Amino acid sequence: HGLIGLTKTVALEAGPHGVTVNAIAPAYVRTPLVEGQIQDQAKTLGIPPEEVAEKVFLAQAAIKRLIAPEEVAELALFLASEKASAITGAVFPIDLGWTAR
């Protein structure tokens, strides 16, 4: 929740200067770090990595897959563009429906 408060506070302070401030809050993104965590859990639990991803990492997600880094990048590019110049103080979950629960 600290990220949300910081985003809103800085957005209010920076807005008069023409600066927008937003945050992206992704769930599990397919990165080497996450892939390593899945492998570690697979060894610990004695189950295949695919099962770890689905039953452990994505158990609460409505969409059962990891997020592609490009999906996060596309949102970041949009938020940094002139097309998003009226958007500030917002937090964008890219969480496969996790926060919908």
Feature roles, as predicted:
Residues G2-G5, R30, I67-A68:
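Conserved cofactor-binding/catalytic machinery of classical short-chain dehydrogenase/reductase
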Residues I63-I94, T99:
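C-terminal substrate-recognition "lid" of short-chain dehydrogenase/reductases
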Residues N22, P26-A27, T31-P32, A90, ...:
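Proline-glycine-enriched beta-turn/loop adjacent to the NAD(P) cofactor-binding site
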Residues G15, T20, I87-G89:
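Short, small/polar-rich loop/turn modules that mediate ligand/substrate recognition or access, typified
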Residues P26-G36, D40, L45:
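Short, flexible catalytic-loop segment of classical short-chain dehydrogenase/reductase
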Residues H1-E13:
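Conserved catalytic helix of short-chain dehydrogenase/reductases
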Residues A14-H17, V29, A80:
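A short hydrophobic alpha-helix cap/turn motif
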Residues D40-E70:
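Catalytic Tyr-x(3-8)-Lys segment
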